[in-house]
Amino acid sequence: MHYPEPISKLIDSFMKLPGIGPKTAVRLAFFVLDMKEDDVLGFAKALVNAKRDLAYCSVCGHITDRDPCYICNDSHRDQSVVCVVQEPKDVIAMEKMKEYQGVYHVLRGAISPMGGIGPEDINIPQLLKRLHDETVQEVILATNPNIEGEATAMYISRLLKPTGIKVTRIAHGLPVGGDLEYADEVTLSKALEGRREV
C-alpha cells in the first residue's frame, strides 16, 4: 500500500520498536493521526526528554535521571549483596517484589556467540572492577533462563570462583498457579533441580 510520505515515515519509525510489525505500525500511525495535536506534542516531548534526561548509573548500570541512581544511593541497602541482571527492566521487576534489599548490577545484554556478543560487549568488566573495589560477599545471578542467560551466568560464576565471593543463581521453575501439563520440558527440569525440602 502506498501512503503519503509523512505516514510512511511514521510507520517506519514505529516498526523500529521491538515487537511492532507492519500491521501494528500502521494502526499506531493512524491512531497518532487521530490524536489531538497537544497530545501528540506531549508524546513527542516525553520521548525526547526520556532520551535526553536518562543515562546509565556509573555504579550499577541501571537507567537513571541522576548519578549514582537512587538504589546505589540508598544507605539502607545491603551493599554486600549484588544481584546481576541483564536489563534495567529486570531491576524494575525485582523491585516490584519489595523483598530484595541488596543492590544490582545491570549487564545490558547477555553473552551470545551466535549474535556476536562476547563478555567484553556487556557490562562484565565493570562488574569485576566493582567487585574488586567493594566489599561484596554474595553475587546473585538473575539472568534470564534461556541459552544466552545461562551462558552468561556460567561465565560469571567461573570468573568469580577464585575470588571467594559466594555466587548463587536464582531458582527457575513453575510459576505459581501454573499447571504441569502446560510447562515445557526445560521448565519442568529446572523445577525438579531447584526442589527443596519441606
From Swiss-Prot:
Q: Which UniProt keywords apply?
A: DNA damage, DNA recombination, DNA repair, Metal-binding, Zinc, Zinc-finger
Stored Pfam families: RecR_C, RecR_HhH, RecR_ZnF, Toprim_4
Task: Give, as residue ranges, the zinc fingers classified C4-type.
Answer: 57-72
Report the SUPFAM superfamilies cross-referenced here. Recombination protein RecR
Cite the Gene3D superfamilies for this sequence: 3.30.60.80, 3.40.1360.10, 6.10.250.240, RecR Domain 1 (1.10.8.420)
Q: Which GO terms describe its molecular function?
A: DNA binding; zinc ion binding
Q: Which family does it belong to?
A: Belongs to the RecR family.
NCBIfam families to which the protein is assigned, alphabetical: recR
**What does the record give as the function of this protein?**
May play a role in DNA repair. It seems to be involved in an RecBC-independent recombinational process of DNA repair. It may act with RecF and RecO.
Protein's name in the database: Recombination protein RecR
**Taxonomic source organism:** Bacillus anthracis
Q: Which gene encodes it?
A: recR
